């Protein structure tokens, strides 16, 4: 019998991407609520309870409601793509490459919180250095990032693409989250194993999909004042054998004139780079990914596969 998958919110940006991916699969049965009945709470509850795995592609409050509809019904496993449960101790964090044993935790979990797109890149860079003891827990980490505008959902997509939209945005690039209170920061701090709240400065570019995340560090402030090669070796060892996360060789990175945010658009992979100069004692760690791929729908499908033993 094929496992039943219900995407609650399949008409949103992430939900549509997941639905498209699963449409090509013949090993699953995707059950869909009629669009006209999406706000029928009782019917949604029936679909949620009928599923083996429910993938929630909803705003935070709506995700909380969906989870409440499954109270006392533990046979349905949940993947939540919202921010709601990413720092909740009862939910497995859905970044399979986070640490040793994380794949198994996801595979065995009933409740999985899909990571945010920005934290996926930042944590991918920071966590290995923390686990290896190179990055002090109290280091004042700063994260700078730019995302494709699809990360803002249907509203931002319309504002960027429709010139007749009343709130049309003509900017080619803009900063937001200016008070430094972005909702991804708690997730980044917890799963990055940082004692000190990191500074996170996100921005959006005039391109649909893609993302660059940067974490600049002073080598002299890291444990043992490591070389670029040592930092690179830690990342390489951490992701050895992983098929989705690639650590670009140091020599190859040194030859690059630029990094294109759209390089991995439409793909599920993530590339990590180590840039810098020994002379100045500075390193810039860079993650390249698709905000809707490894940063959202790709990760959700990866987690679903792990939960199904695939």
From Swiss-Prot:
Q: Which cysteines are joined by disulfide bonds?
A: none
UniProt keyword annotation of Oxidoreductase present = yes
Residues annotated as the enzyme's active site: 117
- Give the EC number: 1.2.1.38
Sections of the chain in a coiled coil: none
Any one Gene Ontology molecular-function term assigned to this protein's record? N-acetyl-gamma-glutamyl-phosphate reductase activity
Give, as in the UniProt entry, the pathway in which the protein acts.
Amino-acid biosynthesis; L-arginine biosynthesis; N(2)-acetyl-L-ornithine from L-glutamate: step 3/4
What are the record keywords, sorted? Amino-acid biosynthesis, Arginine biosynthesis, Cytoplasm, NADP, Oxidoreductase
Major enzyme class: oxidoreductase
Extract the InterPro entries matched here. AGPR_AS (IPR023013), AGPR_type-2 (IPR010136), NAD(P)-bd_dom_sf (IPR036291), NAGSA_dehydrogenase (IPR050085), Semialdehyde_DH_NAD-bd (IPR000534)
Q: Does the keyword Secreted apply?
A: no
* Pfam hit, one: Semialdhyde_dhC_1
Q: Which reaction does it catalyse?
A: N-acetyl-L-glutamate 5-semialdehyde + phosphate + NADP(+) = N-acetyl-L-glutamyl 5-phosphate + NADPH + H(+)
**Cellular compartments per GO CC:** cytoplasm
Role description: Catalyzes the NADPH-dependent reduction of N-acetyl-5-glutamyl phosphate to yield N-acetyl-L-glutamate 5-semialdehyde.
Family label: Belongs to the NAGSA dehydrogenase family. Type 2 subfamily.
Name assigned to this protein = N-acetyl-gamma-glutamyl-phosphate reductase
Organism this protein belongs to? Brucella melitensis biotype 1 (strain ATCC 23456 / CCUG 17765 / NCTC 10094 / 16M)
Q: Which gene encodes it?
A: argC
């Amino acid at each position: 019998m094929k496992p039943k998958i219900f995407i609650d919110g399949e008409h949103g940006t992430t939900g549509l991407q997941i639905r498209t991916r699963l449409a090509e699969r013949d090993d699953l049965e995707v059950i869909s609520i009629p669009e006209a009945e999406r706000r029928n709470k009782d019917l949604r509850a029936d679909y949620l309870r009928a599923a083996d795995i429910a993938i929630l592609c909803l705003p935070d409050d709506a995700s909380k409601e969906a989870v409440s509809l499954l109270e006392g019904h533990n046979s349905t496993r949940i993947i939540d793509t919202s921010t709601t449960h990413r720092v909740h101790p009862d939910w497995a964090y859905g970044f399979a490459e986070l640490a040793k044993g994380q794949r198994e935790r996801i595979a065995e979990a009933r409740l999985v919180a899909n990571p945010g797109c920005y934290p996926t890149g930042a944590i991918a860079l920071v966590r290995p250095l923390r686990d290896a003891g190179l990055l002090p827990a109290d280091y004042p980490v700063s994260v700078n990032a730019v995302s494709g505008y699809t990360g803002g959902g249907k509203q931002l997509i319309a504002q960027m693409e429709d010139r007749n939209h009343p709130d049309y945005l003509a900017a080619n690039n803009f900063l937001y989250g200016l008070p430094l209170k972005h909702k991804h920061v708690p997730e980044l701090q917890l799963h990055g194993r940082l004692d000190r709240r990191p500074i996170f400065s996100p921005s959006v570019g005039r391109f649909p999909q893609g993302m660059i995340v940067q974490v600049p560090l002073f080598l002299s402030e890291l444990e043992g004042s490591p070389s670029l090669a040592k930092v690179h070796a830690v990342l390489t060892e951490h992701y050895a054998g992983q098929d989705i996360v690639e650590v670009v060789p140091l020599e190859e990175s040194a030859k690059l004139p630029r990094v294109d945010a759209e390089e991995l658009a439409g793909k599920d992979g993530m590339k990590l780079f180590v840039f810098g100069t020994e002379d100045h004692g500075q390193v810039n760690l860079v993650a390249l990914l698709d905000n809707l791929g490894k940063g959202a729908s790709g990760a959700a499908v990866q987690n679903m596969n792990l939960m199904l033993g695939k």
